């Protein structure tokens, strides 16, 4: 049996659209939150870094688009 990891590395932008927070392939670095790291099923999954336009940052583990496990917020 061969298990294939379908996660990829990339960039996503997080923002609220129509009252719902979501992750998008395109965004504006000046207004949207930016995620760089592992992506699976269109969401942050694995190791990655999230940066807010105001400089706030989280670096660590992600699961299904949410901070999960170990990480550091600055």
Question: What label would you give each PLM region?
Answer:
Residues 1-74:
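Intrinsically disordered, low-complexity repeat tracts enriched in Gly/Pro/Ser/Thr and acidic residues
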């Amino acid at each position: 049996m061969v298990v294939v990891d379908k996660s990829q590395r990339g960039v996503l932008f997080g923002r609220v659209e129509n009252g719902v927070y979501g992750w998008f392939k395109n965004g504006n670095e000046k207004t949207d939150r930016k995620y760089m790291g592992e992506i699976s099923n269109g969401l942050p999954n694995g190791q990655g870094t999230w940066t807010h336009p105001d400089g706030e940052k989280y670096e660590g583990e992600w699961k299904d688009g949410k901070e999960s496990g170990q990480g550091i917020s600055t």
